[in-house]
Regions:
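Structural transition elements
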Residues: 186, 313-349, 367-372
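Gly/Pro-rich hinge or "lid" segments in bacterial periplasmic/extracellular proteins
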Residues: 160-224, 232-233, 341, 345
């Protein structure tokens, strides 16, 4: 079964739909919006940024070559049309006419080439360099940017929609010191680190992003982000009217959701996925039946409704919803379902039960909602004869620790939880191809499938991704839990309308008005 939605790639050239002359009613007065954040950006260079907080800011000032709709399909962006050669190695992007950089200079194919060249330059130290794929050469032919790859790379179009693939203007790097000059909906005004970032609407902006309704410049004239680290202080600022929007805690979001004076926004298109995984090289987790029993014991509905206040959804696939080829109904036929009775039977067959429990570690890291989920999970496992002792670490230390744990072939078995995000299911390659993320890679057969999907496109690639997902699910290497899962909440006063959150937890203010 292949989902009907697919990338508009292939031999034919994809062309943008004309915006036409639809009339939009714009507010007749200047509208300012202030947003309180817990953490500041660590930089405003999209080709060097690595944190969500930084990329959320760069996404407001810089555009991408392509865009993605909520169904995972790829659409025009800075490129009004694009095509792929028959061998899948050469991409041609026609740069849209009339695009202006924030300083008034023209953004054309030469500017686009310069941006790609800088992103690929090792001296840039781009944390997302590998995601650009095997680009061999870049060239310009009139209005067309040509990118030639050494081999086909299926995720390429999806990556070019992501906030990590933003295009900068040449004037950004003129003179040596980086200046945030892009083509995006907002222009840089000022930045005082760990205090405030001020932006203003780009009067020349023309939107083609399918997630946005407003065809022109944002309704918001001035957009200010204030850093308020303390959650109590952020909420006080929201309730007093000092700010219009905040990053709420999970508990605060639940309270605000019940109050008509406020609105809560969850990043449904986050591309985030929460998984449970195993130290599968250590007995008895080398036995797929034991892994399946663990998965059957996990009550994902309870995790969503109790630990996450009903603000997230349960997941069936090892890839996040809304991404290319994701089919939650199909994945549900491959994976385990909540069935503690069947789980007990599998454990009993392996010799485990109340009088002889399987002792394991539940290795986790600290995040809002996750802590309570792990406590419920511990109870779920106890109900089938598994004695799970929770060990909690900070995020950075956790993944360093897991790299060592997953390399072991003996010792105490462990279940561990993690999250992954992206705009394409190719992150399966990052996770599972040997040696894999924190040494969780599997085997040569999986490696081969992961390599093959990168060289395919359209229905053929979707079928290969489904084959990979089916293998992971039927062998219970991954237990999908919930989506989304971190940094995915925003709240505003009821006076704010039109705010959206896009892929990779991007913040979309183009349609925002304030009464």
């Amino acid at each position: 079964m292949i989902p009907k939605r697919r990338h508009n790639m292939g031999r034919a050239t994809a062309v943008a739909t004309l915006l036409g002359s639809a009339l939009i009613a714009f507010p007749a007065f200047s509208v300012d919006l202030t947003v309180a954040r817990s953490v500041d950006a660590d930089g405003l260079d999209p080709q060097k940024a690595s944190t969500t907080q930084s990329l959320q800011m760069t996404n407001l000032m810089f555009d991408t070559l392509l865009t993605m709709d909520k169904d995972g399909s790829v659409h025009p962006g800075l490129a009004s049309a694009w095509s792929m050669s028959d061998d899948g190695k050469t991409y041609s992007f026609t740069i849209r006419d009339g695009v202006k950089c924030h300083d008034g200079t023209t953004f054309d194919a030469a500017a686009a080439k310069a941006s790609v060249d800088r992103a690929l330059n090792p001296a840039t130290i781009n944390p997302n360099l590998s995601s650009w794929g095997p680009i061999k050469t870049t060239s310009v032919d009139g209005k067309v940017l040509k990118l030639t790859l050494s081999e086909p790379y299926g995720p390429f179009a999806s990556f070019l929609t992501s906030i990590q693939a933003a295009f900068i203007c040449p004037s950004s790097v003129a003179g040596g010191e980086f200046k945030p000059i892009g083509t995006g909906p907002f222009k840089f005004v000022s930045w005082t680190r760990n205090d405030s970032l001020k932006l203003e609407a780009n009067p020349d902006y023309k939107n083609v992003n399918p997630l946005i309704t407003n065809p022109g410049k944002p309704h918001i004239e001035k957009l200010t982000f204030k850093v308020i680290p303390e959650a109590v202080a952020r909420m006080a600022a929201l309730r007093s009217g000092e700010v219009d929007m905040v990053e709420p805690s999970l508990e605060e979001a639940a309270d605000l959701k019940a109050d008509n004076n406020f609105k809560v926004y969850a990043a449904e298109l986050s591309g985030q996925q929460m998984l449970a995984a195993f130290t599968w090289k250590i007995k008895p987790f080398d036995n797929p039946d034991i892994r399946k029993a663990i998965g059957m014991a996990m009550n994902r509905d309870a995790y969503a409704s109790i630990a996450f206040e009903g603000l997230v959804n349960t997941a069936n696939c090892p890839v996040a919803p809304n991404l290319f080829a994701t089919d939650e109904a199909l994945c549900a036929t491959w994976g385990v379902k909540y069935d503690p009775v069947a789980a007990k039977a599998l454990m009993a067959k392996a010799g485990y039960g109340p009088d002889h429990p399987l002792k394991i570690k539940l290795l986790v890291h600290k995040l809002p909602g996750w802590d309570q989920m792990h406590q419920i999970m511990q109870q779920d496992l106890a109900a089938i004869g598994v004695d799970a002792q929770i060990e909690t670490r900070e995020v950075a230390a956790f993944f360093d620790y897991m790299k060592g744990v997953n390399a072991k072939t003996d010792g105490e078995p462990a279940v561990w939880t993690m999250g992954m995000s992206g705009v394409d299911p190719d992150y399966l390659y990052f996770l599972w191809k040997q040696p894999g993320f924190v040494n969780m890679g599997l085997n040569a057969d999986v490696d081969k499938m992961l390599e093959e999907q990168r060289k395919l496109s359209g229905d053929a690639r979707a079928a290969k991704i489904h084959q990979i997902e089916k293998y992971l699910m039927e062998n219970a290497y991954a237990i999908p839990l919930l989506s989304p899962g971190w940094g995915w909440l925003m709240a505003s006063t009821s006076k704010v309308d039109g705010f959206k959150m896009g892929f990779m937890v991007s913040l979309i203010f183009n349609d925002v008005t304030k009464s």
